[in-house]
Each structure stands twice: as C-alpha cells, then as structure tokens.
Design a protein with these regions (language model features):
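N-terminal signal-anchor module of multipass membrane proteins
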Residues: 67-120, 340, 346, 362, ...
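Multi-pass alpha-helical membrane architecture of UbiA-family
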Residues: 154, 158, 246, 288-289, ...
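Juxtamembrane/interface segments at transmembrane-helix termini
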Residues: 146-147, 340-352
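Membrane helical hairpin/interfacial module
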Residues: 110-171
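Non-ligating segments of multi-cofactor redox enzymes
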Residues: 1-92, 102, 133
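Long, contiguous internal "core" modules enriched in hydrophobic/ aromatic residues
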Residues: 92-95, 99-106, 117-126, 161-163, ...
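Short, highly charged, low-complexity non-transmembrane loops/tails of multi-pass membrane proteins
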Residues: 346-374
Length: 374
C-alpha cells in the first residue's frame, strides 16, 4: 500500500477532501507524491522557529510564483478578523498545576536551606520536615489534576529519556527517603545530599516549563533562572520567617537567613526583569499585558520591600524579629503569586501564524499574518 495514493493507507480527512487541498505521503521517499510536490512548490512549516520540526508543509505557490507583495508577517492586535486564530488562554493547567510548582519550588528551597544549616553546624531537622511536606503537597496537587489518578503515578515513570516530568518524579522518589533518613539519623551529610536533590527537583520544574513549546510565557529560556531563583528565595523566605517566630529552634540561623534572603531577592528581581525583557516581542500581547500589570507590585512589594526590611533587621536588632518575619513572608508569597500568574493567568498559547498568504490570481504572494502579537 502506498500512503497518499492508496485510500486504505491514507487518512480519512485526505480522502474526503473534495478540494484536493490536503495531501499525504512519505516525505522521506524522494519518489513519493508529496516529495515531488514539495520539490516544485514554495512551502513553509507553521511555527518552525520553535524547533519542533513538524511534518506539516503548507504550500503557498509554485516555484515561479511572484513574491512581490510578500514581506515580514503582519502582527495584528484587537482585529475582528483575528477571532479563532489569535492566542487564547490555555485551560489544561489550572491552580493545581500552579500548586505543584509552588510546593515543589518552596520545598526544594527549604531543602537547600536545610543543607546550608547542616553545613554550618546548625540543626536542619525542622527545615527538612517542612521541605518534605511542601514537595509532597505539590505532588498531591499534580495527583488531583491527572485525569486517571490511579494510573498516573506509574505511567509518569516510563519516559526518563525525553520527559522532564518523569525526571521530576524520579528525583522526588529519591528525595523523600534521603531527606527522611537525614532527619531520622541526624546526618549532616545526608542533609546536604537532600539539599542537592531539592535543587535538582526545582531545576526539573523549570525545564518542564521551558519545554512547553506552545506557551510563549513558559518556553522562554529566561524561565529557568527565574524558577530556580524564586524557589530558593521562597525557601529562604520561609526559613527567615521561622527563625523570627521560633528563635530557639533555629538557634542563631537568622543572620544567615537574612543574608540569603537579601542575595536571593536581588537575584530573583534580576531574573524577573530579564524574563520580561526576553518576552518583549516574543510573546502574545495579552501575555505581556498580564505580566506588565503585576510588574510594579512584583518589584516594590516582592523585592524592594523585603530587601529594605532585611536591611532594617540587620541595622536595628531590637526590631529584627518583626522585620525578618515580614521580609521572609513577603519574599515567599511573592514567589507563589508569581508562579500562579505565569502558570494560570499569563499562559496564552502561540495562536496560529500564517507565514505566507497563498498566491491567488495575478496579485502574487502576500505577507503572512500573526494575530494577537505586536
């Protein structure tokens, strides 16, 4: 049977297309029907810039077609003709998906702070316990989101060679027994290993987002340093708040936590600003509008305020507990809000972009359109 020629080896949509607008065949065979068509035609692949190498070729003219009217794609916003093709908000990942990134990132950050405490001779037990609880809560959010929750815990382990979700799950499987053993045995060495696993867990979460090629707000390379910095900042923020409330438990770890919050807040605001700069011109208008709307609060409340409060805690020890608590909570809550907004509110998909408008009559090939972008 020859694909594209024999109806029994050809998709029904191609067989049923009375306009002969759809063609199917083996593009790897130079003698196939589609290979011959492609050789004599001008074609493009939709969203080829994503690097996914789709096997759909769009023919917009033959090799002799004029492109006198062709040029760069025209980006349009708020055009009535855009309906149905411009980017729309994805509906597959909701607050439960955001909860996974919140719980996992915060838990990984807490595990890193526990490793730091162990390395400095402090007692990391409370931080390890909180880290395990936070990561477990995040994974439970994923469990709530799965369509077949009884099959998902097993099926997620099947593709370590390609899936960052699989790698996230595998690191989680190792993280829990190591962190529990460190807590049970009081082992500083295992606490440090658990911290490294927590950092790796946050890294996989960042890679999950960057590999979601259909969502411009996620796939940008600047997403990874943002996810890493905010996860660490969230863990440091909660640790700092805990040292203010339970000073006896954390015995002198407050100053280390203050410096960690200061450093990570600076790193995160730099990552946030770089993320927004990288998205400019590389994301739909609605994504940029959502992120731009929360930017002032992210900068002022989420970073300048906690940096100032942490500095005040260092300068005025008498008010250190209150200032440290507020600084830590501000950093953590801002990270949670940031992830929720990126995952749920700013996650507009790519939409559809037509790189070239097919030749009709003598007018030649016109420039393509990219609705919802500017």
């Amino acid at each position: 049977l020859t694909p594209g020629i024999d109806p029994r080896a050809t998709p029904a949509c191609v067989n049923a297309c009375i306009a002969d607008a759809l063609h199917f065949g083996d593009a790897n065979d130079p003698e196939s029907n589609v290979s011959k068509m492609l050789a004599g035609s001008k074609t493009f692949k939709m969203h080829a810039e994503l690097g996914t190498d789709p096997n759909f070729h769009y023919v917009y003219g033959d090799n002799d077609s004029s492109e006198a009217n062709s040029g760069d794609m025209v980006k349009t916003v708020n055009n009535s003709a855009d309906l149905g093709v411009k980017p729309w908000l994805q509906q597959h990942w909701d607050w439960r998906a955001a909860g996974n990134f919140i719980g996992g990132g915060t838990g990984g950050g807490l595990a890193v702070m526990g490793a730091l405490a162990a390395a400095l001779g402090a007692t990391p037990g409370a931080l390890q316990l909180a880290a395990m609880a936070s990561v477990a809560l995040g994974l439970f959010m994923v469990f709530l989101e799965t369509g077949r929750p009884l099959r998902a815990p097993l099926n997620v382990l099947f593709h370590p060679q390609t899936s960052w979700m699989t790698r996230e799950a595998m690191i989680g499987i190792v993280f829990f027994p190591v962190a529990f053993a460190a807590l049970w045995m009081g082992s500083r060495e295992l606490a440090i290993v658990a911290g490294l696993l927590g950092l790796a867990f946050v890294f996989t979460q960042g890679r999950i987002l960057t590999e979601a090629k259909g969502i411009p707000a996620w796939r940008n390379a600047a997403m990874l340093p943002l996810i890493l910095s905010t996860g660490l900042a969230e863990g440091a923020g909660l640790t700092l708040a805990a040292t203010a409330v339970f000073p006896i438990v954390f015995g002198g770890f407050q100053m280390v936590s203050l410096w960690a919050v200061l450093a990570l807040a600076v790193l995160r605001v730099a990552a946030w600003m770089n993320y927004r700069n990288q998205l400019a011109g590389n994301a739909p208008e609605m994504t940029l509008r959502v992120l731009g709307g929360v930017n002032p609060a992210m900068i002022v409340v989420g970073h300048l305020l906690p940096i100032g409060l942490a500095g005040a805690a260092m300068a005025f020890p008498v008010h250190a507990p209150l200032s440290a608590f507020l600084a830590g909570i501000s950093v953590a809550v801002t990270g949670w809000a940031m992830k929720y907004i990126i995952v749920v509110k700013a996650s507009y998909n790519q939409g559809y972009a037509i790189e070239k408008v097919p030749a009709r009559g003598i007018s030649g090939i016109a420039a393509g359109v990219q609705p919802g972008w500017k």
